[in-house]
């Protein structure tokens, strides 16, 4: 199995995300934002956290226009798996690979702590190692993690079981406590919390490792 982890100017969690993938047995290749194609044989693309392009204009807005994101959009359109974490979630929303927007936190403060999440959907390659209702601890670190979506979009997410994770104690004002959402084909996941920071007991817990292991198992079984 092979993962491509994108690197933008201002990314600072790309190596962390690579560690997350490697913990589940993935070979990882780092891909610079100016590349126009993904490496051959890629099974999943990871879009990391950080402050791509300094978060100018809007978080993820400039990164969404980078050459490599055209290749990622094509990859996703062909049924490829994509995981966007924190700034990566913002990029996925800016490219319209996922619905909704990420806005400034409701408290207008940067939030950085382990956050309790509730697994809302266990029927995706990323989440089928969990059970619905599981409470897991995953770190958050963001200033613009307030997920918003209109009534029609929220209704669609709910009816199609596309809300992957919710916050047990909403830290940022996200509508419906949403912490992560899935694409219609369930192969693109965007989430503000950092599962790659919860794959080692020495770092405080391993609840995030289930996500990477779930994806690995799904790819092996495919």
Curated annotation (Swiss-Prot):
Lineage summary: Bacteria, Pseudomonadati, Pseudomonadota, Alphaproteobacteria, Rhodobacterales
Gene expressing this chain: purQ
Main location per the UniProt record: cytoplasm
GO CC annotations on file: cytoplasm
Taxonomy, superkingdom: Bacteria
Residues forming the catalytic site: 86 (nucleophile), 194, 196
Subunit field text: Part of the FGAM synthase complex composed of 1 PurL, 1 PurQ and 2 PurS subunits.
Stored InterPro entries: Class_I_gatase-like, PRibForGlyAmidine_synth_PurQ
Compartments where found: Cytoplasm
PROSITE patterns per UniProt: GATASE_TYPE_1 (PS51273)
Spans through the membrane: none
One matching Pfam family: GATase_5
GO BP terms in the entry: 'de novo' IMP biosynthetic process
Reaction equation(s) it catalyzes: N(2)-formyl-N(1)-(5-phospho-beta-D-ribosyl)glycinamide + L-glutamine + ATP + H2O = 2-formamido-N(1)-(5-O-phospho-beta-D-ribosyl)acetamidine + L-glutamate + ADP + phosphate + H(+); L-glutamine + H2O = L-glutamate + NH4(+)
Single GO term (MF): ATP binding
Gene3D superfamilies according to UniProt: 3.40.50.880
Official protein name in the record: Phosphoribosylformylglycinamidine synthase subunit PurQ
UniProt function note: Part of the phosphoribosylformylglycinamidine synthase complex involved in the purines biosynthetic pathway. Catalyzes the ATP-dependent conversion of formylglycinamide ribonucleotide (FGAR) and glutamine to yield formylglycinamidine ribonucleotide (FGAM) and glutamate. The FGAM synthase complex is composed of three subunits. PurQ produces an ammonia molecule by converting glutamine to glutamate. PurL transfers the ammonia molecule to FGAR to form FGAM in an ATP-dependent manner.
Domain Glutamine amidotransferase type-1 residue range list: 3-222
């Amino acid at each position: 199995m092979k993962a491509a982890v994108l690197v933008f100017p201002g990314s600072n969690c790309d190596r962390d995300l690579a560690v997350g993938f490697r913990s589940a047995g993935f070979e990882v290749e780092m891909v610079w934002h100016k590349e126009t194609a993904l490496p051959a044989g890629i099974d999943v693309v990871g879009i990391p956290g950080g402050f791509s392009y300094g978060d100018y204009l809007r978080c993820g807005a400039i990164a969404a226009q980078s050459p490599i994101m055209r290749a990622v959009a094509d990859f996703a359109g062909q049924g490829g798996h994509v995981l966007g974490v924190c700034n990566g979630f913002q990029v996925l929303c800016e490219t319209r690979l996922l619905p909704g927007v990420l806005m400034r936190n409701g408290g207008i403060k940067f939030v950085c702590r382990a956050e309790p999440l509730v697994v809302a959907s266990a029927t995706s390659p990323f989440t089928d190692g969990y059970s619905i209702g599981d409470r897991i601890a995953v770190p958050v670190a963001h200033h613009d993690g307030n997920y918003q979506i209109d009534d029609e979009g929220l209704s669609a997410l709910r009816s199609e079981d596309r809300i992957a994770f919710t916050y047990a104690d909403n830290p940022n004002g996200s509508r419906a406590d949403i912490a992560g959402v899935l694409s219609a084909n369930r192969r693109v996941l965007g989430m503000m919390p950092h599962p790659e920071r919860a794959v080692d007991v020495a770092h405080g817990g391993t609840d995030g490792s289930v996500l990477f292991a779930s994806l690995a198992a799904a790819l092996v079984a495919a």
